[in-house]
Curated annotation (Swiss-Prot):
Pfam families in alphabetical order: 2-Hacid_dh
Gene3D superfamilies: NAD(P)-binding Rossmann-like Domain
Family as reported in the entry's similarity comment: Belongs to the D-isomer specific 2-hydroxyacid dehydrogenase family. FDH subfamily.
A GO molecular-function annotation: oxidoreductase activity, acting on the CH-OH group of donors, NAD or NADP as acceptor
Binding-site positions, substrate: V97, N121
Transmembrane segments: none
Organism: Saccharomyces cerevisiae (strain ATCC 204508 / S288c)
Name of this chain's protein: Putative uncharacterized protein YPL276W
Length: 145
C-alpha cells in the first residue's frame, strides 16, 4: 500500500523522448523521478490528459492525490474547482518557474503549498539570449537563405 499519490502532468515527447533521455519534461521520461518517488513509498501517476475540466485524467486522479507536478509550458490548470475536489492535495509543484496556472487564493485557503523550481533555467535563458544576439549581429538568417 502506498503512502499517497503523486500526479505528474507532462507533454508527450514521442520519438524525441526515445532519442534523448535528457528530455525530462515529457511523460516518457517523467522528470527522471519515478524510481525516487516509488522508493519513498508513493504511487506515481503520469498523464498528458489535462482537459477538459472536469472529465480529464487529471480530474480523476487529482481526487486522491497529495502532490501534483506540472510544467509551465504544458500546465495543468489547478483551479478552485479542482482544488475543492482534491481533499488530500498538499503540494502543487511547477517543474520550472511560474505559478499562474494555480489558483493561489484557493490554494492558500486550503493551506496547499505552491512551489516552483526558481532559478532552474537561468543558464539556459542566458545562453538563448546570447545565441539570439549572435544570430542578429551576424545576420545568420539572411546568410542562411
Amino acid at each position: 500500500m502506498s503512502k499517497g499519490k503523486v500526479l505528474l502532468v507532462l507533454y508527450e515527447g514521442g520519438k524525441h523522448a526515445e532519442e534523448q533521455e535528457k528530455l525530462l519534461g515529457c511523460i516518457e521520461n517523467e522528470l527522471g523521478i519515478r524510481n525516487f518517488i516509488e522508493e519513498q513509498g508513493y504511487e506515481l501517476v503520469t498523464t498528458i490528459d489535462k482537459d477538459p475540466e472536469p472529465t480529464s485524467t487529471v480530474d480523476r486522479e487529482l481526487k486522491d492525490a497529495e502532490i501534483v507536478i506540472t510544467t509551465p509550458f504544458f500546465p495543468a490548470y489547478i483551479s478552485r474547482n479542482r482544488i475543492a475536489e482534491a481533499p488530500n492535495l498538499k503540494l502543487c509543484v511547477t517543474a520550472g518557474v511560474g505559478s499562474d496556472h494555480v489558483d493561489l487564493e484557493a490554494a492558500n485557503e486550503r493551506k496547499i503549498t505552491v512551489t516552483e523550481v526558481t532559478g532552474s533555467n537561468v543558464v539556459s535563458v542566458a545562453e538563448h539570449v546570447m545565441a539570439t544576439i549572435l544570430v542578429l549581429i551576424r545576420n545568420y538568417n539572411g546568410g542562411h537563405q
